């Protein structure tokens, strides 16, 4: 299956040390790092420079190793090149002649079958796709240490040792590399540096100064140590010899880059990536803000919230102090943060818009002091000082609100609105009364709301535009006859200029005065004196009725209703327990008899323990008690007789079972005869009771 096409095709040219020509790697983006494998380059060519340089180092293991790997036939070279072309179109591969690292993967068969070196077998390579084998470099280091002790040995012994060292299992030299795969949730640590190295190495060749050949054993040892360190991502720190490291970028395309490039350009890329991320976030938030600003604030919700807020806060005066120092600080800070906060402020201005009514009266003045002061405070309403971009973007919203204001004003007749005196209170507690109509005052008003999150106690305000009253006619139509409270800075005295930042509080018409007395205090329930008098009389009548009620039944707590149900005194109880209705007493005595109480308990008062003196018509307590006793006796006898019949039947059945003479028809006949006998006996008892 072919891999997905790359977003940015890259062509990387690598010229490592040793003058061994590396192939041009044309890498496409793989799906994950586990699918990106190193393929061992089988087309090693050993030129004259390397032969002379390696010959200068006596007893060097490079001679035997490189010569054994260079003895590859031309057919093998062409075959490996063809296979490499086929695989280059499927996934990215790296060819590094210094490392010659091999990994198991999907192309393990075609990449390793072309090798003629006897120390490397395809069967010895582990089949783990998440590991990178650096066996050759580690093998060379161990051979170097052992061959320094055996410098006097011949080349044949070196060849023999190389074959013997090839018998070691390949997993012993597996380098630890954490696979970076998006499917496993892992991300490479050097994201910024790796992405920069991708961009810098695209269609670019490394400088030719990296083509130096290691000419001594110390230099080759240090270069191989830097090449095959356990963590190859840190290999660019060794700058004595060109060290190439395998780095995984964010889009998981394997690259080979130089250490000097990675070290020099890592910091500016991080800054550029951070700035790009900020800009992208701001643009996204600005789009969301512009799309949601038209739906968050409607005129009806603004009016409801305005009325609720005005009634809940009593005598609320929001001071606004605007000095020259604060304006200078606001201007300087806005110049510094203009580029950074321009997009964010446009995106979040609608979140700081406390009251939607201020949008009706837009003051299109463009004083720089007002704009800077607006950017300086976080909890400020941005209605009067909206930027041109956001104002043009929200033009349909403002026009719709103006149109709704005109419709509202047309519905309300001016004759119903009485003239009110608008109270202007400055911060210096000087009160000025101005007589004006509600519809002639063209002042933008916004209800301040404290910003608890930022700790800014100052609330938003709007600049009055008194000369241009025709622009702000909508607010007068929506809130006719309202009381406007202005908070003016004390340093300005009585001068009200156009560039003064003040706070306007809209007090509904229900408020009677500006001293904090709400409509609740005014509209105290003043009842009609006639109604109050009637209520008092009814209460007095109830009290008198209770006093005049007299005797009540101690069972039903009611007075004598009729002559047939009179109150009687059955015992010596006094007070509220003295009297009782006749019907209530009958029901009570019947309940006591049915409960199975004795005759003495029925005829005795439960409270005073005296004998009841009853003279009730058609109610004989003794007869009722005797009848109930007879019923109880019959019930008990029947219950006992049935019990005996069942017991006798069970005994007879068990006896017949024991004797073995069980005959079902005869047993049924006996049971029927026993039942008849019991029934006859009960009839005899009933007749005897009737005779008595």
UniProtKB/Swiss-Prot annotation:
Keyword vocabulary terms for this entry: Acetylation, Cytoplasm, Metal-binding, Phosphoprotein, Transferase, Ubl conjugation pathway, Zinc, Zinc-finger
Zinc finger motifs (RING-CH-type), residue ranges: 545-615
Compositional bias segments (type: Basic and acidic residues): 37-48, 140-153, 516-532
Catalytic function, reaction form: S-ubiquitinyl-[E2 ubiquitin-conjugating enzyme]-L-cysteine + [acceptor protein]-L-lysine = [E2 ubiquitin-conjugating enzyme]-L-cysteine + N(6)-ubiquitinyl-[acceptor protein]-L-lysine
Family annotation (SMART domains): RINGv
UniProt xrefs under Gene3D superfamilies: Zinc/RING finger domain, C3HC4 (zinc finger)
UniProt cross-references to SUPFAM superfamilies, sorted A to Z: RING/U-box (SSF57850)
Entry GO CC: centrosome; cytosol; nucleus; plasma membrane
Residues found modified as Phosphothreonine: 687
PANTHER family membership: E3 UBIQUITIN-PROTEIN LIGASE MARCHF7, MARCH7/10 E3 UBIQUITIN PROTEIN LIGASE FAMILY MEMBER
Function of the protein: E3 ubiquitin-protein ligase which may specifically enhance the E2 activity of HIP2. E3 ubiquitin ligases accept ubiquitin from an E2 ubiquitin-conjugating enzyme in the form of a thioester and then directly transfer the ubiquitin to targeted substrates. May be involved in T-cell proliferation by regulating LIF secretion. May play a role in lysosome homeostasis. Promotes 'Lys-6', 'Lys-11' and 'Lys-63'-linked mixed polyubiquitination on ATG14 leading to the inhibition of autophagy by impairing the interaction between ATG14 and STX7.
Protein name, UniProt field: E3 ubiquitin-protein ligase MARCHF7
